[in-house]
């Protein structure tokens, strides 16, 4: 049965055409034929440049961006989407958005970590944004995976290098392998490429192992997690816990009232059509 998934990026996608094109090609490859992934980014003008990585390094700034993810989730549900995906490895507002929606909500980072645990005993994350490593370590603890987590480390190149790598990937892939082998030597038997721009570059170039160690396709992981949760909801009626402080669902009317009171609704997104 067909399904529609709202993809939410931390980037302004129209500012990054090479990345946007790479994502579209990869989603077409990994999603089921009857799954439609509709790509959405942050509001135009969110960042002073095409690079969001500086903001993502600071907890308080990341939290200030958070309402865009919550409002996108609300828009997804109200537009009839079957699932909502936060496609950014720090899983911005994942817990809060999951508590606020009835449709399945998946996170890029959580999906990658959970799938990594099915492929090996311990995983390590390689990022081009070094300032995010502390948050990823904290997320691993919050997801109950501290004993399976080796480290999150800087991969040895930058976002600009990744963008250039879309047209000339060979050198960047070799540099990634050097960093991966260091992580493997420290005990990782699964490697998670941190940010989605790096993940899609590696996946579109067929990099799924370094020597005998798997390299996670984190984008495919959240796609398959979303498809599975939609299937389980349809076939078995499974849905999230609504018990307690973190899982209790707030009244939608009050949520919208507060978003408007704090001036957030001017950034509320509109659903796009799939391509």
Each model region followed by its residue ranges:
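N-terminal glycine-rich phosphate/adenylate-binding segment common to multiple enzyme folds
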Residues: 63-101, 105-108, 189-201
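Active-site rim beta-loop-alpha module in soluble metabolic enzymes
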Residues: 141-199, 203
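C-terminal and late-domain segments of enzyme folds
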Residues: 8, 189, 194-201, 215-244
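Glycine-rich, highly charged phosphate/nucleotide-binding loops
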Residues: 56-75, 171-177
């Amino acid at each position: 049965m067909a399904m529609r998934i709202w993809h939410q990026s931390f980037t302004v996608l129209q500012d990054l055409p090479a990345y946007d094109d790479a994502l579209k090609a990869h989603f077409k490859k990994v999603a089921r034929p009857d799954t439609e992934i509709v790509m959405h980014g942050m509001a135009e003008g969110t960042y002073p440049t095409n690079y969001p990585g500086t903001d993502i390094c600071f907890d308080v700034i990341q939290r200030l961006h958070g309402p865009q993810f919550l409002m996108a989730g609300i828009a997804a549900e109200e537009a009839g989407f079957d699932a909502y995906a936060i496609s950014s490895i720090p899983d911005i507002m994942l817990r809060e958005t999951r508590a606020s929606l009835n449709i399945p909500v998946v996170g890029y980072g959580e999906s990658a970590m959970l799938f990594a645990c099915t492929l090996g005993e311990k995983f390590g994350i390689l990022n081009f944004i070094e300032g995010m490593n502390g948050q990823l370590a904290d997320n691993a603890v919050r997801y109950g995976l501290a004993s399976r987590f080796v480290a999150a480390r800087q991969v040895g190149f930058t976002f600009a290098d990744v963008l250039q790598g879309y047209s000339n990937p060979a050198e960047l892939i070799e540099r990634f392998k050097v960093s991966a082998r260091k992580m493997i030597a420290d005990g990782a038997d699964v490697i998670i490429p941190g940010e989605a721009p790096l993940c899609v570059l590696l996946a579109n170039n067929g990099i799924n192992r370094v020597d005998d160690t798997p390299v996670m396709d984190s984008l495919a992981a959240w796609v398959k997690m979303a498809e599975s949760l939609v299937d389980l909801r349809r076939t078995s009626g499974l849905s999230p816990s609504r018990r307690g402080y973190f899982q209790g669902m707030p009244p939608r009317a009050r949520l919208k009232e507060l978003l408007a009171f704090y001036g957030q609704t001017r950034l509320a997104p509109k659903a796009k059509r799939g391509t």
